[in-house]
Amino acid sequence: MAMQGIESQDWAWFTFSRVRVLRELADGRSERDAAERLGIAYSSVRSVVEELKNKTGLHSVREIGHWWRGQAGEWLAWCAEQAGAAQKGYGTGGD
């Protein structure tokens, strides 16, 4: 399973729409099940999966789901940093 590293500046490519699909795949769902749960067309999920394969260098839905389970926290930290929330402790109850 060859994976390309994602540089921090590449996290912007992972839109919320793509991440919603990634979450479903990480939970072990098929593309068809992901589409149904998200209320979007199967073809839309297929398009996202093909984009993800190109971006990550992975070859299967299962590999992508496994990869995302290891990357989601880093992406979330990047989002918090972009919003300025990482340094200020937003959401910790100590504002």
Task: Describe each region flagged by the PLM.
Residues 1-10:
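Short, Lys/Arg-enriched N-terminal segment that forms or immediately precedes the first helix
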